[in-house]
Every structure is written in C-alpha cells, then in structure tokens.
A protein has these predicted regions:
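Short, surface-exposed amphipathic charged segments that create phosphate/polyanion-binding patches used
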Residues: 29, 70-75, 125-130
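Active-site neighborhoods of divalent-metal-dependent phosphate/nucleic-acid chemistry enzymes
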Residues: 54-99
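Acidic, PIN/NYN-like endoribonuclease modules and their adjacent C-terminal/linker elements
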Residues: 15-17, 89-93, 99-130
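Short, well-structured N-terminal submotif of metal-dependent ribonuclease cores
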Residues: 1-16
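Hydrophobic/aromatic ligand-binding patch that stacks against planar heteroaromatic rings
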Residues: 4, 86, 104
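A generic local structural motif
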Residues: 1-2, 42, 80-82
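Short, glycine/charged-enriched secondary-structure capping and boundary segments
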Residues: 1-3, 28-30, 108-111
Length: 130
C-alpha cells in the first residue's frame, strides 16, 4: 500500500476525507506499539505516505450527495458514508478491500471500487500522466 501511495503520483491522484488525518493522529500510540517505532518515526512515515494524498474537507460535498451516501451504506456500515459521498461527488473509485462493503453496495448497484491488486495492475499497464 505504501508503494502505491508513494510511487504512483505520475499515474494516479489520491484524495481522502480530511478526517482521515485526525484518525491517524488519534492512533499514534497504537501505531507506535504495533510498529515498534518511536513517535517521530511514525510521524515521518505518515508524512511520506500522506504527502501524495489530497485531503479534502467534507464541506465541499453537497448535502444531497451525503444523504444518498447515507442511504446506501445505512444497513452495511454507516462509518463508510464519507467514502461513498466522496466517490459520488468527485466521480472517483474507492480504494478498498472491504468485501462486506463492496458486496453490499454492489447489490445496490454501486460498484465504484478498486482493490489494491487492481491498482498495482493498473499502474503496471498504464503510462504515466504528462
């Protein structure tokens, strides 16, 4: 995953909800523990991984898009509302391996997903952007 984020800027543009930065910050202690890294090392790793991601505030998305996204994920995983709303608003794919989410939304006609394996294959088979 790190390779895709760090080495794909010539091929892809990554966007994410701004709250994702806050989520990473909240989990610094756990990240230090499971990685065995000091806080400064975790912060540096975060910088390297996140520097190619454009973080966008949710205020840019229309209320109607939020409502549509909420309805789609209500019985699957309401915590994924942000990702569906961003995908619909920016007309982009959701990078995910969450099979429950992907299958649940596919049953409702929403199939705008790409997996890590698909991203690697796509990058391998495409030319860099100018």
């Amino acid at each position: 995953i790190g390779d895709l984020l760090i080495n794909s800027q010539k091929y892809l543009e990554f966007i994410a909800p701004y709250f994702l930065r806050e989520e990473i910050f909240k989990h610094y202690p756990r990240l230090c523990k499971i990685s065995g890294m000091a806080l400064e090392q975790v912060r540096e790793s975060e910088f390297q991984v996140c520097k190619e991601i454009t973080f966008i505030s949710e205020e840019q998305i229309k209320q109607s898009t939020w409502l549509t996204a909420e309805k789609l994920v209500a019985d699957i995983d309401p915590k994924d509302t942000h990702y569906v709303a961003y995908s619909k608003h920016f007309r982009c794919k959701i990078w995910s391996g969450d099979k429950v989410l992907m299958n649940g939304l596919a049953r409702k006609g929403f199939t705008n997903f790409i997996t890590t394996d698909e991203l690697f294959k796509w990058r391998q088979n495409n030319e860099p952007r100018p």
